[in-house]
Structure formats: structure tokens, C-alpha cells
Amino acid sequence: MNQIMVIGISSGVGKSTFARKLGEAIDINVYHLDVFYWKPNWVEATLEEFSKAQQEIVSQRQWIIEGNYSNTFEIRAENADTIIY
């Protein structure tokens, strides 16, 4: 369990909290997709920018990525060894 996706049904269900606590417990960096999707002043990243950020993360040996964004789901799913729903 080195490359982990944390997804859920909607916002506010505890994905971020769970991912943070899991990351602390197993000493793996946690990446919250909202940080990469939302730029200053609530401007949305382009699909290219958002995808590139995730490609950089999944190239690492260990990661936890938290978030539901379906338009880039495959980037994470193809590289994850564990998916937690």
C-alpha cells in the first residue's frame, strides 16, 4: 500500500480528514486535489494543468491522493495500488 486513492460519494464526508490521518499513520505524503484544481480567487485550473499536476504526483513511489474529480480519475486509478472508497 504505497499509492493510494481516497475517494467518496460527495464533499463533506471526511475524505480529507481520513487521508490526512492515514498519511500520518503510514508516513506517506497526502495530496488534496482541491489544492491543484482551485487557483487563487477560486479560478479553476485548466484540464491540462490539473492533469499535469497529478501526473507528477503519481510518478512518485509513494502518495495518497484525496478527491473525486472524475475527469482525471484514470490518471490516479491506473497508478494506484489501493483505492479506498
What are these regions (language model features)?
Residues 29-83:
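Conserved nucleotide-sensing/catalytic segment adjacent to the nucleotide-binding pocket
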Residues 15-16:
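Walker A/P-loop
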